[in-house]
Amino acid sequence: MPDLSAGPVLLRSHRLDDVDDMVLACRDEQTWTWTTVPKPYEPEHAESYVNRTVGTPIDGETRWAIEVDGRFSGNIGVMLEGEARRVGEAAPVGLGRADVGYFVAPWARGRGVGTLALWLVCDWAFRKGGCEVVTWNALVGNVPSRRMVEKVGFHIHADPARRMVVQRGERVDVWTADLLPEDLVPLDTLLP
């Protein structure tokens, strides 16, 4: 799994020294409200996550830690589907899809960190993952996440997908959006 970087953002493998900041981030009310992380979020959750994800794609999903100024500042991952799972091989055009998901720690919000991380992962999915389309889903009402995907070039679907995601045992509605390679905005338009 390659490191990816732009501006102040570094995407890298998770490390055990991320655990304390991961716990802080996942105990944040906004993170809990808009994601499916367990509540309460304990150090064991973070340790298990890090141990499962260090450096290797899992079931087609590649996950990175978001780092800013040497500090863990969130998670981002892309789930490659179909032919796109053959990372490193030339996947046939038109067969690759991916879903992207992320959260940004409270201390990194409002600085464009999530937008840059999202751009890096989408660019990687198109160039290296064999993807022709990247899809995003977020719980209806998660306006900051919606703004991020719009800045990167995603097109929001008109109607929410009804009860598409399970969050802590309840089915909830989500916004959905898709990004094609030609829709990805130039990186320099996002840099500080």
Give each language-model segment a name.
Residues 1-30, 63-192:
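Acyl-donor (CoA/ACP) binding surface of acyl/acetyltransferases
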Residues 30-52:
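Conserved GNAT-fold acetyl-CoA-binding loop/helix
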Residues 34-39, 60-66:
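A short, aromatic/hydrophobic, helix- or strand-capping loop or linear motif
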Residues 52-53, 124:
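A generic secondary-structure signal
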Residues 54-59:
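Short loop/turn motifs at secondary-structure junctions and domain boundaries
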